Amino acid sequence: RTAAALIRMAAERVDNRVVQDPRVFAERLRMVSRKLIRITGGIRPMPGKRHVAALCGTTGVGKTTTVAKLAARFALQEHLRVALLTLDTYRIAATEQLRVYADIIGVPLKVAAAPDEAAAILDEFGDRDLVLVDTAGSSQFNLEQLRDLQALLTAVRPDETILVMAANTPVEDLRVVAARFSVLSPASIIFTKLDETRRYGGMLDFLLERGIPLAYCCTGQNVPDDIELATPGLIAGLMTEGSTNRE
């Protein structure tokens, strides 16, 4: 529904001859998506000034793998001083998975189980350009878990909190998740699992309704490759061809 509406809006802005030119029409579609769907430009740490970004979301959406992708990008490609902090003490396997990635990337990883412990670790990471915080998956229906997570993030005081959601989630569930996780004041969204669906209308509907900016899209499990910065071209590609490889 959303994709069709945006395509119609793009078509209304050009005459029939221009619509026949796919390159021109794609540019018009990018312009329309830029106006209607907000994007953030991604995490933007400044060298020499610590930036803390925390990822939160429900179970199984790929937060830990996404943290690893971001860590690899910023540490290996942008040559920033990165550190990892995990607040997920429920899943030992997830912590060990992140530890393997941290060792490969060459960044420190610490685990915190309590608010005061998390705050102390953040002090240790004071010389880092970017601290990425992984959190335990919380059910949108488990208010106690959300309160515990809120207490941990209050101690961490992230510069930005990002809500991670799966693109193959029904739009009704996306709405409920966003409403429940709003207590954490997420500044943006990362959508994962774009490789597991070709129906992006619900995701786009959600972004239009909530007005919350999109930061990244993840398209698979490969670290660090399967993550794309959200751009108008990427969104236009999702609407037309189901492709995320757009500049």
Locate predicted features.
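NTP-binding/hydrolysis catalytic cores, primarily Walker-type P-loop NTPases
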Residues: 1, 204-247
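Primarily NTPase-proximal linker/entry elements flanking Walker-type ATP/GTP-binding cores
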Residues: 1-82, 86-89, 100-107, 111-114
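Switch II (G3) loop of P-loop NTPases
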Residues: 56-59, 78, 82-93, 101-148, ...
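Short, solvent-exposed amphipathic alpha-helical segments in soluble enzyme
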Residues: 70, 99-102, 149-150, 178-182, ...
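Conserved beta-strand/loop subsegment of P-loop NTPase cores
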Residues: 81-83, 133, 158-165, 182-224
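Conserved ATPase-coupling elements of RecA-like P-loop NTPase cores
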Residues: 94-96, 140-146, 173-175, 200-202
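Phosphate/Mg2+-binding loops and adjacent switch elements
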Residues: 156-177
